[in-house]
Curated annotation (Swiss-Prot):
InterPro entries: F-box-like_dom_sf, FBX25/32. Transmembrane segments: none annotated. GO terms for molecular function: actin binding. Substrate-recognition component of the SCF (SKP1-CUL1-F-box protein)-type E3 ubiquitin ligase complex. May play a role in accumulation of expanded polyglutamine (polyQ) protein huntingtin (HTT). It comes from the Eukaryota. Pathway: Protein modification; protein ubiquitination. It comes from Macaca fascicularis. Part of a SCF (SKP1-cullin-F-box) protein ligase complex consisting of FBXO25, SKP1, CUL1 and RBX1. Interacts directly with SKP1 and CUL1. Interacts (via C-terminus) with beta-actin (via N-terminus). This is F-box only protein 25. The F-box is necessary for the interaction with SKP1.
Length: 358
């Protein structure tokens, strides 16, 4: 007799009628495990001293295979078991679906492990992890937590290997460690899924990552090829005008005196302010020099403290309004709309979080 679970399409549990009443059938894996345990006990009794060495070798080989299997399970994200890289976002119970889609479930299903290897999606995933660290960490299930820290580990290792955007990861780890410190101190007052000792170990891991990033040294590349210093001024200026982050401009300006001169250009910072903020916001935070000129560089960082900067990503998750499905655009999803492209909406990291607030 099958027992229907929350989803009526689920195979459910199998039950068998006995003289003592209905009993749930055990899965094959449980039976095999019990048989293996029974065989191990029987072997330890039956084996004599000569066969003991052979059995120990077999046992060692079995343990080695088991360790490799466990390592593969731990190293592999749970989300990789899902072939579809999309998820249906439902917020209420229906006849076909009982319950609703959670942030943790979406985090498990969407392919974030592969996304961090794509330079277009890297900043997007990091920003998403940062928002989860700030406000949604307690809403993650145990499996989602494991996926979260597995992805975070891969991000840190990627930064240590190729030195890509370490400042962004430092900000993420700082926010995550601050949140964890507050939650661990207030244990019992806040809902923190999992054992407190596990969270303390995770906090220690985060502190170790922070130290590794702090000790990160950029190796100077020795080659005879073309460098930034060899480019003409108008090309260097063009490169600076393509940056959307003020800190990137300052960092590049520290490379050579020429780049420093170009990075202090008032017109450059004016364009950056106009890109991120509205004119009404300028009027509220005007900063003038002694000569009466607007200090656009100082204004940029002042405005950044009061208003969110414009976010720009190479690739983002998309939401299909027709199907209510969240997906990566490259992977696609089974859309039934006549004109699918007209139904797609880019999803910012904050919008992703808001989709799962009930």
């Amino acid at each position: 007799m099958p027992f229907l679970g929350q989803d009526w399409r689920s195979p459910g549990w199998s039950w068998i009628k006995t003289e003592d009443g209905w009993k749930r059938c055990e899965s094959c894996s449980q039976k095999l495990e019990r048989e293996n345990n029974h065989c191990n006990i029987s072997h330890s009794i039956i084996l004599n001293s000569e066969d003991g060495e052979i059995f120990n070798n077999e046992e060692h080989e079995y343990a080695s295979k088991k360790r490799k299997k466990d390592h593969f399970r731990n190293d592999t994200n749970t989300q990789s078991f899902y072939r579809e890289k999309w998820i249906y976002v439902h917020k209420e119970s229906t006849k076909e679906r009982h319950g609703y889609c959670t942030l943790g479930e979406a985090f498990n299903r969407l392919d974030f492990s592969s996304a961090i290897q794509d330079i277009r999606r890297f900043n997007y995933v990091v920003k998403l992890l940062q928002l989860i660290a700030k406000s949604q960490l307690t809403s993650l299930s145990g499996v989602a937590q494991k996926n979260y820290f597995n992805i975070l580990d891969k991000i840190v290792q990627k930064v240590l290997d190729d030195h890509h955007n370490p400042r962004l990861i430092k900000d993420l780890l700082q926010d995550l460690s601050s949140t964890l410190c507050i939650l661990i101190r207030g244990v019992g007052k806040s809902v923190l899924v999992g054992n407190i000792n596990i969270w303390i170990c995770r906090l220690e891991t985060i502190l170790a990552w922070q130290q590794q990033l702090q000790d990160l040294q950029m190796t100077k590349q020795v080659n005879n090829g073309l460098t930034l210093s060899d480019l003409p001024l108008h090309m260097l200026n063009n490169i600076l005008y393509r940056f959307s982050d003020g800190w990137d401009i300052i960092t590049l300006g520290q490379v050579t005196p020429t780049l420093y001169m170009l990075s202090e250009d008032r017109q450059l910072w004016k364009k950056l302010c106009q890109y991120h903020f509205a004119e009404k916001q300028f009027c509220r935070h005007l900063i003038l020099s002694e000569k009466g000129h607007i200090e656009w560089k100082l204004m940029y960082f002042a405005l950044q403290k009061h208003y969110p900067a414009k976010e720009q990503y190479g690739d983002t998750l998309h939401f299909c309004r027709h199907c209510s499905i969240l997906f990566w655009k490259d992977s696609g999803h089974p859309c039934t709309a006549a004109d699918p492209d007209s139904c797609f909406t880019p999803v910012s990291p904050q919008h992703f979080i808001d989709l799962f607030k009930f």
